[in-house]
């Protein structure tokens, strides 16, 4: 039995865990307090590994980042950044229009408040930026962690190849630990679902359903409205034939592989059939698999604002704009890690003074809905890589 279970994919295991958790909560509610340990251990493991993960991942990515010599790379990168920002803005609007409530353990956290003005926000950001790096990691100050990782990463771009390789090896090692933690997600989710449904009842299903609708609806809006507008402005023509071709041939594959990196060969093959210059595609598509994460920006923004709404924190327009930028930057570090966008939610939550403990509960909620969220997110991310690359190449041919 255990051997059969071990052969199942993580998605299948999570689905089974959710069904079992709901079943236990409805049939044996008195047992659920004993199952809470599984969820607590899972959240504790995520809390422990998240700070060092963000630090090492961002540092290594920047230290080893090399820009190619393709003349078309800059406009592709511009589309990547603009696309992610607009995706984050769309997520803000969707979250405000359809606010979601999460079931969180918020004991002693009911007095949280967002900064009152833009000056307060910038002051808090600056104070977080210049935090002691060791203290930032130990206290899970993700803004400080991000600042030190970016600074050290930029400095290490001029270091020897051996040093860069060491950083890359450390990054791979931390990622391996994350994979081990994620492997225990079904057990943790089983405990979390059982306790949540025993405490809140079937109303929890409605909450998760609304959250999923907001997430998936925003991603569809980005794929079918935002991206076509950007592509249409780029190629000065009807974008939808290209958009639908990329969604069909790249998005569907990415939906089931749930990995932008694994979908790179599919995108390169599609780019070749679309007649894209190989010197452009060979750089921009692998680069896009690393940094172009519009779906991740949506996930980070929606779940962060759902947390803010749950805690009753008031936010103004300036804070939301900063959140969109933070979500975009965080999304760039989401590649290559199972559940990467979910594990970077604490970075955005820290903007509102939300503790790491609550942020990790939100990550756990994200794990529960990740069966659909992660697949759709990857489909959007990966199809956008080849879409924007092809659009810039078409524009280049028009100008030549």
UniProtKB/Swiss-Prot annotation:
**Keywords from the UniProt entry:** Amino-acid transport, Cell inner membrane, Cell membrane, Membrane, Symport, Transmembrane, Transmembrane helix, Transport
Membrane topology reported for the UniProt record: Multi-pass membrane protein
* SUPFAM superfamilies in the cross-refs: Proton glutamate symport protein
Q: Name one GO molecular function term.
A: amino acid transmembrane transporter activity
Cell compartments where the protein resides: Cell inner membrane
Instruction: Kindly give the InterPro entries that the UniProt entry links to this protein.
Output: Na-dicarboxylate_symporter, Na:dicarbo_symporter_sf, Ser_Thr_transp_SstT
Q: Which residues cross the membrane?
A: 14-34, 48-68, 76-96, 136-156, 177-197, 211-231, 285-305, 311-331, 349-371
**Alphabetical list of Gene3D superfamilies matching this protein:** Sodium:dicarboxylate symporter
- What Pfam families would the database entry show? SDF (PF00375)
What's a GO cellular component annotated to this UniProt protein?
plasma membrane
Where does it mainly reside? membrane
Q: Which reaction does it catalyse?
A: L-serine(in) + Na(+)(in) = L-serine(out) + Na(+)(out); L-threonine(in) + Na(+)(in) = L-threonine(out) + Na(+)(out)
Ribosomal protein as a keyword of this entry, yes or no, is no
The reply to whether Nucleotide-binding figures as a keyword in the UniProt entry is no
An example GO biological process term is:
threonine transport
Protein family: Belongs to the dicarboxylate/amino acid:cation symporter (DAACS) (TC 2.A.23) family.
The protein's job, in short, is: Involved in the import of serine and threonine into the cell, with the concomitant import of sodium (symport system).
Provide the protein name.
Serine/threonine transporter SstT
């Amino acid at each position: 039995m255990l051997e059969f279970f071990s052969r199942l994919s993580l998605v299948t295991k999570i689905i089974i865990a959710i069904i079992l958790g709901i079943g236990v909560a409805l049939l044996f509610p008195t047992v659920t307090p004993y199952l809470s340990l599984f969820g607590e251990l899972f959240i504790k493991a995520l809390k422990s590994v998240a700070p060092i993960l963000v630090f090492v991942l961002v540092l290594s990515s920047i230290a080893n980042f090399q820009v190619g010599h393709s003349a078309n790379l800059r406009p592709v990168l511009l589309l990547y950044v603009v696309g992610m920002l607009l995706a984050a803005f769309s997520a803000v609007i969707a979250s405000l229009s359809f606010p979601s409530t999460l079931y969180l353990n918020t004991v002693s956290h009911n007095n949280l408040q967002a900064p009152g003005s833009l000056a307060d926000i910038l002051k808090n950001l600056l104070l977080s930026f210049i935090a002691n790096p060791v203290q930032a990691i130990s206290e899970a100050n993700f803004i400080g962690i991000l600042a030190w990782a970016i600074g050290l990463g930029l400095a290490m771009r001029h270091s020897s190849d051996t040093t860069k390789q060491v950083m890359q090896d450390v990054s791979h090692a931390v990622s391996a630990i994350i994979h081990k933690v994620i492997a225990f997600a079904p057990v943790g989710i089983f405990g979390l679902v059982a306790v949540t449904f025993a405490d809140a009842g079937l109303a929890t299903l409605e909450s998760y359903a609304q959250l999923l609708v907001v997430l998936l609806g925003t991603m569809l809006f980005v794929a079918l409205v935002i991206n076509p507008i950007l592509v249409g402005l780029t190629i000065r023509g009807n974008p939808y034939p290209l958009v639908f071709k990329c969604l069909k041939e790249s998005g569907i594959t990415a939906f089931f592989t749930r990995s932008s990196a694994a979908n790179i060969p599919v995108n390169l093959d599609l780019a070749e059939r679309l007649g894209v210059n190989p010197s452009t595609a060979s750089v921009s598509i692998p680069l896009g698999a690393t940094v172009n994460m519009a779906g991740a920006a949506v996930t980070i923004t929606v779940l962060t604002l759902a947390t803010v709404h749950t805690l009753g924190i008031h936010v103004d327009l300036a804070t939301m704009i900063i959140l969109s930028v933070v979500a975009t930057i965080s999304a760039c570090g989401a590649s290559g890690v199972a559940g990467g966008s979910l594990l970077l939610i604490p970075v955005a939550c820290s903007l509102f003074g939300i503790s790491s403990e609550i942020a990790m509960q939100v990550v756990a909620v994200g794990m529960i809905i990740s069966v659909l969220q992660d697949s759709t997110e990857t489909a959007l991310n990966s199809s956008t890589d080849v879409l924007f690359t092809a659009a810039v190449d078409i524009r280049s041919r028009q100008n030549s």
